[in-house]
Swiss-Prot record:
The keyword Zinc applies. Transmembrane segments: none annotated. InterPro entries: Amidohydro-rel (IPR006680), Metal-dep_hydrolase_composite (IPR011059), Metal_Hydrolase (IPR032466), MTA/SAH_deaminase (IPR050287). PANTHER family: AMIDOHYDROLASE-RELATED DOMAIN-CONTAINING PROTEIN, AMINOHYDROLASE SSNA-RELATED. It comes from Unknown prokaryotic organism. This is Isoxanthopterin deaminase. Keywords: Hydrolase, Metal-binding, Zinc.
Length: 482
C-alpha cells in the first residue's frame, strides 16, 4: 500500500509561477516551472506536470503564484491591540517603550491577551505566513494566567507552526521603575524553572515541529546580568533550545555596552556565551564591520525588522553586508505597536525597498570618488523571499520547513493577483513582494492542511473580531494611566 493510499492528497494545479525559497543558485533554484504541486499528508510529494489521481482534492491555481509560506522570526503578538497609540506614535525606541508597551502591558488580562494573540496570528495567516515566532515578555511573579499556553492554543486553533520565544527579565531599567507591579521582574530560578516546564510540555526538536520553545530574555544587555547570560545559555544548550533576544536596535545599545563593559554589544554577547549557530537576534541595526564578521564567524543569525525600525526611526539593518559575510538572515514583523502593518507581505516589500535605499544613500558623485549610481543590486526579489522563508526556518532549526521542494513540509501560500496593483506585471512571480499591498490568499497550507481559503479562515468572523478589538481598545484607553 502506497503513502498516497493512506494519507490525504491534494493537487495544486496550473500555477502561473512557483517560487521555491531557494537561493537562486544552480543547485538551489529560486523558482521551478511546475505548474503543479502534489501534497501528500503534511509533505510536498511532487512538483511538475502532474496528472490527477482518483479521489484527491484539486485546487485550481490558474493565474495564481505560489510561494513557500512565510516564516516570521520575531513578533510581539500582545501588541496587536496597541496599534497607532498616540503617545508613542512619534517617539524613538526608549520613550516609545515607556509610552506604549510598558504603560499598557499591565492592563492585559487573559481575555485581552488572548484576543491580541488571535488578531496577530490571523493577520499573519492572511498574508501567507504559516510559522510564527513570538517574543512574549508578558510574565511576572504571581501572574494569574499562563500567557505561553494561550499563545500555543491560539496558534493550534489556526493550524500554524508556533515558536515561543520565552522572554522575561530578572532586572529592570529606570524606564520601568515607576510602572505597575505587573512589570515586576522574575527571579532567575523562576525564569529557568518556567523554561524547563515549557520545554517539557511543548518543545519538539524535530525538523518540521509544530511547536518549539526558545530561551529569549527580553534584552540580554539590560534584562539579565552578565552572570545570568552564561547561566541561561548553559540551560538552553542543556535542554536543546535555541536562543534569541533583542540587540543593537539603536545607538543606545552601543553606548551602554561601551560604557558598562568597554566593548561592542556583539563582542560582549560572545564573551558571555550568547553567540552561535543556535542564536539569532532581532534588529542588529547598529553594528560595525567587526561585529558583522563575528556574527558570521559564529553563525549567529539576524531577524530583520525593517518596518518597526523605520517607524521608530532606528535606522536600517545592514543586511546586504551581513548576507555577503555569511550571516544567516531572516525577517520578522516585530510588534504591531511599532509596526501597524504587522503582516509578512508588508514586511518583505519594505525589506526589498529599504535595502536598496540604504545602499543608494552611500552613493557619492564621481568627483568625490564615487563609483556607483545607486543601490538597486542590494536585494533581489529571490533573496528577499529566501530570507523570509528558508532563511527564517534556518535560524530556528526547522530544517524541513520554508521551501517549496519535494520532501519539505507542505507550508505553501497561493496568491491570487486579482487587484489592479498587480495588473500589467511582466513577471507575475514577483507580484507579492514587488507590488506590496496584501494579495488575496487563495490558499494557505500549513503542514498540508488548508488553513486559509479565499482569504477566509474557518471559524473566524472578521467583522466580529474587529468589533471586539474596538471594544477592548476603548477599555484600555479608559483604564490606562495618562
Amino acid at each position: 500500500m502506497t503513502t498516497y493510499d493512506t494519507q490525504p492528497s491534494t493537487l495544486i494545479r496550473n500555477a502561473a509561477a512557483i517560487m521555491t525559497g531557494g537561493r537562486g543558485t544552480a543547485d538551489d533554484p529560486s523558482r521551478v516551472p511546475g505548474p503543479d504541486i502534489r501534497i501528500v499528508g503534511d509533505t510536498i510529494d511532487a512538483i511538475g506536470a502532474l496528472a490527477p489521481r482518483p479521489g484527491e482534492t484539486i485546487v485550481d491555481a490558474t493565474d495564481c503564484v505560489i510561494y513557500p509560506a512565510w516564516v516570521n522570526t520575531h513578533h510581539h503578538l500582545f501588541q496587536s491591540l496597541l496599534k497607532g497609540e498616540p503617545a508613542g506614535l512619534d517617539a524613538t525606541l526608549t520613550p516609545w517603550l515607556a509610552a506604549t508597551p510598558y504603560r499598557f502591558r499591565a492592563l492585559f488580562d487573559e481575555r485581552r491577551f488572548r484576543l491580541a494573540a488571535r488578531i496577530g496570528l490571523i493577520e499573519l495567516a492572511r498574508s501567507g505566513c504559516a510559522t510564527v515566532a513570538d517574543h512574549n515578555y508578558v510574565y511576572y511573579p504571581g501572574m494569574p494566567f499562563d500567557s505561553s499556553a494561550i499563545l500555543f492554543e491560539e496558534a493550534e486553533k489556526l493550524g500554524l507552526r508556533f515558536v515561543l520565544l520565552r522572554g522575561g527579565a530578572t532586572q529592570t531599567r529606570q524606564l520601568e521603575a515607576d510602572l505597575p507591579t505587573a512589570l515586576r521582574p522574575e527571579t532567575l530560578d523562576a525564569y529557568v524553572a518556567d523554561i524547563e516546564r515549557l520545554a517539557a510540555r511543548y518543545h519538539d526538536a524535530s525538523p518540521r515541529a509544530m511547536r518549539r520553545v526558545v530561551m529569549a530574555p527580553t534584552t540580554v544587555l539590560y534584562s539579565i546580568s552578565p552572570r545570568e547570560m552564561r547561566e541561561t545559555a548553559a540551560v538552553a544548550r542543556r535542554l536543546g533550545l535555541r536562543m534569541h533576544s533583542h540587540l543593537s536596535e539603536t545607538v543606545g545599545y552601543q553606548d551602554s555596552a561601551y560604557s558598562m563593559y568597554g566593548k561592542s554589544p556583539v563582542a560582549f554577547c560572545g564573551e558571555h556565551d550568547w553567540l552561535g549557530s543556535d542564536v539569532w537576534y532581532a534588529h542588529l541595526v547598529k553594528v560595525d564591520a567587526d561585529e558583522i564578521a563575528l556574527l558570521a564567524q559564529t553563525g549567529t543569525g539576524v531577524a530583520h525588522c525593517p518596518q518597526s525600525n523605520g517607524r521608530l526611526g532606528s535606522g536600517i539593518c545592514p543586511v546586504r553586508e551581513m548576507a555577503d559575510a555569511g550571516v544567516p538572515v531572516s525577517i520578522g514583523v516585530d510588534g504591531a505597536a511599532s509596526n501597524e502593518a504587522a503582516d509578512m507581505i508588508s514586511e518583505v516589500h519594505m525589506t526589498w525597498l529599504a535595502q536598496r535605499a540604504r545602499l543608494g544613500m552611500l552613493a557619492q558623485p564621481a568627483y568625490r570618488g564615487g563609483s556607483f549610481e545607486g543601490g538597486a543590486g542590494a536585494a533581489s526579489i529571490a533573496e528577499v523571499i529566501h530570507w523570509g522563508t528558508a532563511g527564517g526556518a534556518r535560524v530556528m532549526g526547522l530544517d524541513e520547513v520554508g521551501k517549496v521542494a519535494v520532501g519539505y513540509a507542505a507550508d505553501i501560500a497561493v496568491y491570487r493577483l486579482d487587484d489592479p496593483r498587480y495588473f500589467g506585471l511582466h513577471d507575475p512571480a514577483i507580484g507579492p513582494v514587488a507590488s506590496g499591498g496584501r494579495p488575496s490568499v487563495m490558499a494557505l497550507f500549513s503542514a498540508g492542511k488548508r488553513v486559509v481559503v479565499d482569504d477566509l479562515i474557518e471559524g473566524v468572523d472578521i467583522k466580529e473580531l474587529g468589533g471586539e478589538a474596538r471594544r477592548v481598545v476603548r477599555e484600555l484607553l479608559r483604564e490606562v494611566v495618562v
